[in-house]
A protein has these predicted regions:
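Glycine-rich phosphate/adenosyl-contacting loop at the front of the ribokinase-like
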Residues: 1-63, 68-72
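Ribokinase/PfkB-type carbohydrate-kinase core domain
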Residues: 1-13, 59, 63, 71-89, ...
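Short acidic/glycine-enriched loop/turn segments that link adjacent beta-strands
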Residues: 92-95
């Protein structure tokens, strides 16, 4: 019997607001979207969801805001089977991304890092055992660089 690999993800959790447009607006122009949707994203959380859906035992490490979006996000992680005890709730807003996608599939993204930038190397120390017990740790650069460096060193 093969054991399920433990995968830790240290990274971002954003609420994505995606707008489909016929073209990108010019500076100062207001453009009506062809459609819009809200989804749970962030490069770190996207990695965690993909790994969990592929059959891995996933541990997410990051920060969510003390707001309704953060609570909704935590429920989403649990629904995906992602262990979230390494996700801290902090006194700021949950990260958000505003994504514009044109008909060709090109995009522009504006990110409000919010709670993602509250994660510190000191906070990461409390999750060191999660990383050390993992077969692999996934990182990206939507958290402070010093956090990524600290996680890579564990």
């Amino acid at each position: 019997m093969t054991s399920v690999p433990v995968i830790s993800v240290v990274g971002s959790l954003n609420v994505d607001h995606t707008f489909r447009v016929s073209r990108f607006p010019e500076p100062g122009e207001t453009l009506t979207a062809l459609g819009a949707e809200m989804s749970f994203g962030g490069k770190g959380a996207n990695q965690a969801v993909a790994a969990a859906r592929a059959g891995g035992k996933v541990r997410m490490i990051g920060c969510l805001g003390n707001d309704e979006r953060g609570r909704e996000y935590r429920a989403r992680l649990e629904a995906e089977g992602i262990e979230d005890s390494g996700v801290l709730t902090v006194g700021t807003s949950t990260g958000a991304a505003f994504i514009t996608v044109d008909r060709k599939g090109e995009n522009t993204i504006v990110v409000d890092s919010g709670a993602n930038h509250a994660l510190t190397p000191k906070m990461l120390e409390d999750s060191a055992f999660r990383i050390e017990e993992s077969a692999v740790t996934l990182l990206q650069l939507e958290c402070p660089p010093e956090v990524v460096e600290a996680a890579a060193g564990l």
